[in-house]
Structure formats: C-alpha cells, structure tokens
Amino acid sequence: MPINCKVKSIEPLACNTFRILLHPEQPVAFKAGQYLTVVMGEKDKRPFSIASSPCRHEGEIELHIGAAEHNAYAGEVVESMKSALETGGDILIDAPHGEAWIREDSDRSMLLIAGGTGFSYVRSILDHCISQQIQKPIYLYWGGRDECQLYAKAELESIAQAHSHITFVPVVEKSEGWTGKTGNVLEAVKADFNSLADMDIYIAGRFEMAGAAREQFTTEKQAKKEQLFGDAFAFI
C-alpha cells in the first residue's frame, strides 16, 4: 500500500550507514521481518528491511541504510531522505512486503544470520522477541568486513548479557585488532553447530550469501528448506 511519510531524523551510525526514522501519515501494519520499498519513480521502487518491530515503533518506521560511495542505489535514497528532511517534503513508500517474517507459532530455536546492513532485518525480529518475552533460544550471528560495520555490537552484547536465552556472535573478515571470530559468517555458524535440523533460520544479506547458506546448511547441517526464511529466497 502506498503511504506518504515525513522524515523525522537521519543519524549516521558507522561506515556510511544511516538510521532513518520515518513518520507515516497513517499506521503501517507489518510483521517483524518484513520490508518496504521506497518509491523513487513510477517503475523505481527500492526495497529496505524495516529495522523496527511492530510492537515498538510507536507509529514510526526505522530503516538502516548502508550508502557506501560505490552504492548509488542506496545512496540516492539517503540523499532523497536528507532533502525531504530539510524541506519538510514527503517520501513515498509502499509497505508491507515479504514472506520472511517471524513464525511465532513455532517452538523451535531461532538462528538469526545477518551480513552487513542485513542486520536491520534480524534486528526487527530480535526486538519483537524481546518485547513479546519469547524465551526460546535465539542465536544471532552478524558478519561484517571489519568491526566498524557491526555498528550495534555494543547494544547486542548488552542484550545478550541481560537475556540468558540470547547468544550474540559477531564475525569479521579482517582480523587486525580483533579478538573474536574471524572469516565467513556462514563458516562460523557451521563450526558452532553439529546440526541445524531443529532450528528456524532467518537470514539477510547478499543474494549469493543467502544461496550459499541454503545450499550448505541443507547439505552439511541437516537444515530443512521449509525452516529457512529470507527475502532472497523468493528470487533465487
């Protein structure tokens, strides 16, 4: 459904990533794990995961947009948002979209995997689980090129300390000055679990990462395709 929004704030997070708060002219009903599209033109709709959870957004929608210099696709959206914030103009979105929302009727443990700004997808799901006091085991693996990309690392470490059923594992590719897990986030998951058969797996990142996860987890770790969720799976 097309909805006009005001841009309430734009906050730089780290590594060319911005937290953007939108205030829609009417409430948007969505599920944790869904996404919206920013309408840049009649045939130009650009998808971004909703980072806020349905039960906490208080009418606002939070986005985390990574707009590195080489990424004009996202950078143009951020510039459009900045212009709307300065002028008080509207941003047109279309929402909600996606079938990779949290399956709340499942009793299985949850594995949340994010690559880079794919974190916004799993953040919505994690925040929803906390606010709804869902107590089943939740494992969150977040991979980035370096520690700078993991802009919510301190927040997630605090959450994991406060909730014994939540485990947070950051993984970076560049190990200089880093004492945690290094390398590929999918390899880190495979090293930590003998089997993924009894897990609901939610994943967000580049299409090639999602495809590799589906292939490797089902063939090597007994994961079930029907228990793998991610927007990429609708396209690959």
UniProtKB/Swiss-Prot annotation:
Organism (species): Aliivibrio fischeri
Record's Gene3D superfamilies?
Answer: Nucleotide-binding domain of ferredoxin-NADP reductase (FNR) module, Translation factors
Q: Which residues bind pyridine?
A: G115, G116, T117, G118, F119
The function of this protein is: Involved in bioluminescence. It is a good supplier of reduced flavin mononucleotide (FMNH2) to the bioluminescence reaction. Preferably uses riboflavin as an electron acceptor when NADPH is used as an electron donor.
Q: Name one GO biological process term.
A: bioluminescence
Question: Which SUPFAM superfamilies does the protein's record reference?
Answer: Ferredoxin reductase-like, C-terminal NADP-linked domain, Riboflavin synthase domain-like
Q: Is Flavoprotein among this UniProt entry's keywords? A: yes
Domain of life of the source: Bacteria
| Alphabetized CDD domains for the sequence | flavin_oxioreductase
GO molecular function per UniProt:
oxidoreductase activity
| Entries under InterPro entries matching the protein | Cbr1-like_FAD-bd_dom (IPR008333), FAD-bd_FR_type (IPR017927), FNR_nucleotide-bd (IPR039261), MRET (IPR050415), OxRdtase_FAD/NAD-bd (IPR001433), Riboflavin_synthase-like_b-brl (IPR017938)
Give the UniProt family note: Belongs to the Fre/LuxG FAD/NAD(P) flavoprotein oxidoreductase family.
> Per UniProt, what is the name of the gene that codes for the protein in this document?
fre
- Ranges for domain FAD-binding FR-type come to 1-103
What keywords tag this UniProt record? FAD, Flavoprotein, Luminescence, Oxidoreductase
The enzyme's E.C. designation? 1.5.1.-
Protein name in UniProt: NAD(P)H-flavin reductase
Q: Which cysteines are joined by disulfide bonds?
A: none
